[in-house]
Amino acid sequence: IQPRYNMVEYADDFGMDNLSKKGKKNIKIAQKQNLDIQFGHKELLEDFDKVMKCTEERKGISLRTKEYYELLLDTYADDAFITLAYFHIHDMLKETKERYEKCLFDLDNCTENAKKKRFTLEELKDSLEKKISKYEEDVKTYGETVCVCGTLTVKYGHTSEILYAGMNEDFKRLMGPYLTW
């Protein structure tokens, strides 16, 4: 296996304190999305292959087949694992609709002379309407839950290598890779 890029990060140097401001911000964004992080083996192979296909399409390249990933998992057995991040679209849609209803209620009860508050609520209303529309479209396309990104990692001694990593471009705004990589 010959990686195109090789990055070394020592465990002692790894942590939130050593991340850039943007890295910390993106981790916080990802944590707010309530992504479901799962670790596993062959049981996650189907979804891992799907995110790798998304990466192939996005980059216009050809990577490996599902059978190859399965062979890696078999070969390295307990020293290989898959990490996936799932986004529960339906749950987020429900939560966003509840926030939208509260926003409408607050707008109805907002006094005429509270112009700043009314303006803020109007902007929030517009933002929530866009999110609801996007989530409804995503539910139609992907179903209630979608795998947004994943990695295939191999442990070797005191180190580990992420051999393959992929993501679904439609959900890049969730910053899922910050929780799986």
Language-model features: locations:
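A conserved beta-strand-loop-helix scaffold within acyl/acetyltransferase catalytic domains
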Residues: 1-172
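Conserved acetyl-CoA-binding loop-helix of GNAT-fold acetyltransferases
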Residues: 172-181
